[in-house]
């Protein structure tokens, strides 16, 4: 794959997306692809430091958004764009859709301001100076917020986002639905309320339909 591929995993906390990233990476490698695994916020030394601040320090929505896009710019420049230029498949746990869902829909931050930050941070970091980088495919793990909350309660100690009330995640889920409606060619909805094996089958079918894996008979 000479041009690489950029695949993002999205969904509210507790949707179960992160547990499927490694399995997809293994399947893609078995199919002959070189795969880069990364996450947001994070992926570089600078972005990981900003991640720690975002997850554990108290701040308002504007500060969150500024830190997220600063981390994203560094991540694109240092990790994502170089990997794509090498023809790799980049699997990223969250990207800009999460910012619109969490800071936009969840926190109520101005979507027009987020769009401006998006253009500023994501333009001119690749081979084409006027290109705004977006994913080739976004796998949206959709689950009722109540189900996600039950999963989180049984997991590790929650961070600042995971400890938000169900009402917050209901707004975030609506934000993801709005993003999916606005980019139907890029988004693929995965019903992650189903058992793990069925979720994995949905995931593989979507990726196979894009030509990155063999179709399952």
UniProtKB/Swiss-Prot annotation:
ATP binds at residues 11-18. GO terms for cellular component: cytosol. GO terms for molecular function: ATP binding; dTMP kinase activity. One of its GO terms (biological process) is dTDP biosynthetic process. InterPro entries: P-loop_NTPase (IPR027417), Thymidylate_kin-like_dom (IPR039430), Thymidylate_kinase (IPR018094). It holds the Pfam family Thymidylate_kin. It comes from the Bacteria. Keywords: ATP-binding, Kinase, Nucleotide biosynthesis, Nucleotide-binding, Transferase. Its EC number is 2.7.4.9. It catalyses: dTMP + ATP = dTDP + ADP. Disulfide bonds: none annotated. PANTHER family: THYMIDYLATE KINASE, UMP-CMP KINASE 2, MITOCHONDRIAL. Belongs to the thymidylate kinase family. Phosphorylation of dTMP to form dTDP in both de novo and salvage pathways of dTTP synthesis. HAMAP family: Thymidylate_kinase. This is Thymidylate kinase.
């Amino acid at each position: 794959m000479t041009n690489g591929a950029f695949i993002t995993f999205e969904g509210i906390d507790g949707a179960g997306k992160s547990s499927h990233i490694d399995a997809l990476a293994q399947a893609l490698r078995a199919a002959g692809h070189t795969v880069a695994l990364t996450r947001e916020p994070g992926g570089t030394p600078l972005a990981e430091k900003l991640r720690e601040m975002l997850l554990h320090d108290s701040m308002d929505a504007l500060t969150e958004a500024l830190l997220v896009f600063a981390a994203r710019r560094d991540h694109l420049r240092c990790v994502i764009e170089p990997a794509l230029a090498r023809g790799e498949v980049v699997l990223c746990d969250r990207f800009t859709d999460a910012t619109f869902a969490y800071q936009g829909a969840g926190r109520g931050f101005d979507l027009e301001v987020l769009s401006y930050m998006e253009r500023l941070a994501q333009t001119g970091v690749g081979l084409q100076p006027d290109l705004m980088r977006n994913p080739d495919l976004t796998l949206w793990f959709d689950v009722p917020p109540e189900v996600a909350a039950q999963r989180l309660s049984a997991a590790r100690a929650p961070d600042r986002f995971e400890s938000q009330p169900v009402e917050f995640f209901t707004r975030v889920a609506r934000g993801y639905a709005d993003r999916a409606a606005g980019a139907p060619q890029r988004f693929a909805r995965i019903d992650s309320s189903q058992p793990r094996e069925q979720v994995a089958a949905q995931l593989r079918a979507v990726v196979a339909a894009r030509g990155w894996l063999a179709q399952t008979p």
